[in-house]
């Protein structure tokens, strides 16, 4: 068994010797996924998908179920940690040009969309005030679809408004989608190991590869330990750090919150949606804010893969990162000046990255060729 283990780790999983800590987020995401599925299973045992009982069942879990408060808070906080890791993972991919491994990148974008759908359905389940109104606003965007919008929305709601059938549907979808995420994750990993992982330099690693275990597996274990430590530190001292105060009140369709917003990890897309004063345009912009990631492999023009050697592209990347954070911040604010203007400008900067980066690549190629010729 020992020889088989050595053969597997040495020959099937060789990795470039110079990959950095940024390459540890994949294993951290797998840890988050396992944690979410485990805690989610125990929550599903005690949860009741009924609009009159859902809120009470969540309170019952935290108060009466042994260690229920740990399970519930770990699941809620784990979702935030999951998205922190996945945004870091995507940022690493954009910075180091890992999107050129097209199939891995496209499967990753599919994973992101599935994960966001899963998190959205899960956010509605406690049937708190903000959960209810966020679900109402977001699902109502489907009515912007020409011809089919009203039919699709009515089918999703299970009626003419968000009610008991809607909650049942959302619970069923929230339960089944993680298994689709597992399948997509398996495809993502298989495709990655088919071509092999890249490195920070963006060069071919074939001449300098080392066994994944023990050299990189211990790095993964260290980062996973740090992740779990941070998770349980927040869980112990500030368990409601990312929770909305409105969600501690049971959903009331007769009272609208002053400011409706989804969870923080959707705020960048929600901010882009709000920056466009048109329902269909906003819905398309929201969808495009995620779908535009699929364009990265097809619009790469630079001869250099990694941004490590592209100073102009680095500036553009950090403008994107700043725009992302700023959109998230403005989406937490009321829809009034100056937040509307800031949101519109930062949304423009967000999309500009994917349009300017190809042109910047061509300019860099021109500069490089000129210097080489002289």
Curated annotation (Swiss-Prot):
InterPro entries: Cyt_b/b6_C, Cyt_b/b6_C_sf, Cyt_b/b6_N, Cytb/b6-like_sf, Cytochrome_b, Cytochrome_b_C_euk/bac, Cytochrome_b_N_euk/bac, Di-haem_cyt_TM. Binds 2 heme b groups non-covalently. One of its GO terms (cellular component) is respiratory chain complex III. The cytochrome bc1 complex contains 3 respiratory subunits (MT-CYB, CYC1 and UQCRFS1), 2 core proteins (UQCRC1 and UQCRC2) and probably 6 low-molecular weight proteins. Belongs to the cytochrome b family. PANTHER family: CYTOCHROME B (PTHR19271:SF16). Heme 1 (or BL or b562) is low-potential and absorbs at about 562 nm, and heme 2 (or BH or b566) is high-potential and absorbs at about 566 nm. This is Cytochrome b. It comes from Calliophis bivirgatus (Blue Malaysian coral snake).
